[in-house]
């Protein structure tokens, strides 16, 4: 605290020292006293209202406090006074990244890297912005650029691994996530990412074992328990999933996602009142969550209360308007209310979002029967039957792969099956897994399918 005393003594002699107030603010900031830091920066601003660095520092305090609009406002004032200030461009990009405005983040981070090409934060954040905007190939180059300069950054290895996973380059994905874990083995989400990669390769036992390793570092981490529960849930082991979700909320009673996941598992176990209780707890913590509103609506549907169900499902559809399942259940609620016109509207929206939503196809077929539009009913029910038969055969092959995840012949059969039904993208993804497992012949087939996909996209 000696430095603070010196600055304050200097200010007793001359209050008009904005740089001194900035230095005082910096000391408080590095001592994690943001409120005192903000007061000092505000003093500096009063003394020199055109100083870009002051506004940048004020913006950083607001950013750390989660007040993104106020942070952005101050950063933009800083940029107005100094348009060559690379740090403030990075900070504006970071705020947009945190707020989900990925395209704006890309623009500002490009400015930052142009002004200060040697700063690795700008390139790393730019990679993250590209990844989050769905431009995964572009993100890889930026992460590699950072690692070429500093190869020991675990978070960059992890994010590069996630990007490779998004491109279905399994070998590279696993390698880089493992590199992250070697450099910092105590970070839970590294294990979760590696577990997801192995689970996607149908290696469920290994995926669960990786999460168990994460729990040896921190047994009370709810996110890891939820990840374990999700693996059990997708394999239909709802009781095991529920145990994991229970562990999550036992360690963190304020973890809304744990209660949401618990409510979903209880719903599938037909323990409806308990499901409602868990989902209401999740909504109490996070009222504007589409998932919790969706499933509590489904609980009310199962309890034959379509009016209440509709209210929750409608709210869910506003919160997540691109979720085909929400629109399907909203249509289902209208069917229970015998509102055939709205049922058709909502079910049609579900099918627009997911043309393979067989439940919605079946439901709208029944709605058209009620509306005496028999030709349309037959058409939709025929598509439903075709999809049902396809999924039955596909699921049989997937079950065999889960039992024998390293048998290459099964992957080849599944890829052929997908291509025969014109699902070329899915066939290519299966072959990528086969290539990772060592099937040399699959590589040639994969290249052929890639060519077909490129032709189709022109």
Identify the meaning behind each predicted range.
Residues 23, 57, 91, 125, ...:
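Canonical tetratricopeptide repeat
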Residues 1-9, 23-26, 30, 60, ...:
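Alpha-helical segment of the N-proximal tetratricopeptide repeat
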Residues 378-380, 386, 393-458:
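Terminal, low-structured helical/coil segments at or just beyond the last alpha-helical repeat
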Residues 18-19, 52-53, 86-87, 120-121, ...:
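Helix-start (N-cap) detector for alpha-helical repeat units in TPR-like alpha-solenoids
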Residues 1-9, 30-43, 53, 64-77, ...:
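Structural signature of tandem alpha-helical TPR/SEL1-like repeats
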Residues 329-340, 346-370:
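Repeat-solenoid scaffold signature
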Residues 13, 47, 81, 115, ...:
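Structural marker of alpha-solenoid helical repeat scaffolds
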